[in-house]
């Protein structure tokens, strides 16, 4: 019997919906690999280069683009200037050997689906009630040595458009996972993963 191909489980949702916490728990509890994305934004406190992101400057992005290795790239005009987030074909993915867990945006999910094929990607859309999400974002930003409240507000408003119901439907995302209760959300995600492949 032929071995099942791996999947790319694509975790996405609005900012402060709990994606990072769910991601860490899933990585600890399941034999999944990750695809570390790239960004031109500065490191946040507690982040490490090569763990959450590969932090490269604009010159690094230009070099990878010239080499034709960019799978998808999004650039946001922040109050601190343009910040790009992107995925690179750098040899991290081998679906014949493993399944992967990735955090990304709806836009990046669509581009990854076009690159790897729809059968390889499984969307996991996380949501939290907006008031709770805003409070979580504010609490997290207060912990930064230099809080960026204007950027927090920009992200919150941009998420409303980026993850609209219409855009989710157009991307073929029909299931969502409430993260009001992290344990329940984690259980539901694991059930989906088990159905999709043996992880």
Residue ranges and their predicted role:
Residues 19-20:
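Walker A/P-loop
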Residues 142-196:
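Small-molecule kinase domains that catalyze NTP-dependent phosphoryl transfer to phosphate-bearing small molecules
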Residues 14:
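P-loop (Walker A) phosphate-binding loop of NTP-binding proteins
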Residues 100-105, 116-140:
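Conserved phosphate-donor/acceptor-positioning beta-strand/loop module used by diverse small-molecule
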Residues 23-24:
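The feature captures the helix immediately C-terminal to the Walker
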Residues 41-100, 104-106:
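ATP-dependent small-molecule kinase phosphotransfer cores
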